From Swiss-Prot:
Keywords: Ribonucleoprotein, Ribosomal protein, RNA-binding, rRNA-binding, tRNA-binding
Protein name: Small ribosomal subunit protein uS7
GO biological process, one term: translation
Entry GO MF terms: rRNA binding; structural constituent of ribosome; tRNA binding
Gene3D superfamilies the record matches: Ribosomal protein S7 domain
Purpose of the protein: One of the primary rRNA binding proteins, it binds directly to 16S rRNA where it nucleates assembly of the head domain of the 30S subunit. Is located at the subunit interface close to the decoding center, probably blocks exit of the E-site tRNA.
Length: 156
């Protein structure tokens, strides 16, 4: 029996402008040093930029980009008799969404020049078109899982 109490997930309030839980989580992932207002401004500006460039609703482009960057399967190392195998496992939906958000933010931060809102908008637009670094990372993850399909029976 575990000695520590179970850690329960905190309920995250939806964001103020679009009333979206997913967007609220994204803002929290983007936030650095507790600067939530700055993170909100960056995300809302990025959504406005995406909406103008695509002539669609910015939130729809955001959701499509996030969906395209979301992985379905990943590999986890599993040690079996002295050898470490990369075992493919299915990703829980909440973890998959978190991974996609993390990859998009990382790719946007890596881009050079311009404001963060513009870089984030550019990365999201590319992700919504099945391009960009975040989608490439998802494809890489899927390829790795496909290559290690032989070890799927080591799943736990």
């Amino acid at each position: 029996m575990p000695r520590r109490a179970r850690k329960f997930k905190r309920a995250v309030a939806p964001d103020s402008r679009y009333n979206s839980l997913m967007l609220s989580n994204f803002i929290n992932k983007l936030m650095m040093h507790g600067q939530k207002a700055t993170a909100q401004r960056i995300v809302y500006d990025a959504i406005d930029i995406m909406g103008k460039q695509e002539n669609k609703e910015g939130l729809a482009v955001f959701e499509q980009g996030l969906k395209n960057a979301t992985p379905f399967i990943e590999v986890k190392p599993r040690r079996v008799g002295g050898a470490t195998y990369q075992v493919p496992i299915e990703v829980r939906p909440d973890r998959a969404q978190t991974m996609a958000m993390r990859w998009i933010i990382k790719a946007a931060r890596k881009r050079t020049g311009k404001s963060m809102a513009e870089r984030l908008a550019a990365e999201m637009l590319e992700a919504s078109r099945e391009q960009g670094a975040a989608v490439k990372k998802r494809e890489e993850t899927h390829k790795m899982a496909e290559a290690n399909r032989a070890f799927v029976h080591y799943r736990w």
